[in-house]
């Protein structure tokens, strides 16, 4: 687990060495591995969530780097956004989960963002929270 802690402490230096393209995939693998080990190591889930936060923090720069490297390809799935939205939804933090999904969709990351947002909006309605329109047409609700 030491390598992951060092990555979090030195993320600015790592970003300079790897670039946002490389850093995106370092955090993706960190999320994947730590989440896989969550039942084995007591701090694995916290480390996975910390990696999600870092990957989301650099999402815009990573998207630019990926689009520059592969201009003809759509952006891939973003583990940080996906896992963060899932964790927030599980914790019933629906407003924050909806915001994360919206950011991921706006940035163009692949994923089932529209479906996730509909599911979260339904849960908000069931809890009695108003779902307000974002557009003047009223067609897009949050």
Regions flagged by a language model, labelled:
Residues 10, 44-47, 51, 93, ...:
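Alpha-helical solenoid repeat scaffolds, predominantly canonical TPR units
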Residues 52-57, 94-111, 138:
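TPR/TPR-like (Sel1-like) alpha-helical repeat modules
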Residues 30-31, 56, 84-85, 91, ...:
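Heptad-repeat amphipathic alpha-helical coiled-coil interaction surface used
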Residues 62-66, 106-117:
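Boundary/linker segments of alpha-helical solenoid repeat arrays
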């Amino acid at each position: 687990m030491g390598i992951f802690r060092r990555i979090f402490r030195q993320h600015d230096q790592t970003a300079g060495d790897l670039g946002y393209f490389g850093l995106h995939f370092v955090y993706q693998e960190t999320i994947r591995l730590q989440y896989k080990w969550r039942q084995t190591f007591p701090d694995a889930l916290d480390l996975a969530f910390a990696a999600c936060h870092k990957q989301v923090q650099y999402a815009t720069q990573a998207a630019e780097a990926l689009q520059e490297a592969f201009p003809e390809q759509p952006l891939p799935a973003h583990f940080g956004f996906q896992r963060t939205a899932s964790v927030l939804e599980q914790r019933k933090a629906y407003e924050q989960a909806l915001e994360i999904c919206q950011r991921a969709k706006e940035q163009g990351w692949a994923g089932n963002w529209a479906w996730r947002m509909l599911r979260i909006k339904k849960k908000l309605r069931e809890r009695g929270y108003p779902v307000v329109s974002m557009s003047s047409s009223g067609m897009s609700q949050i």
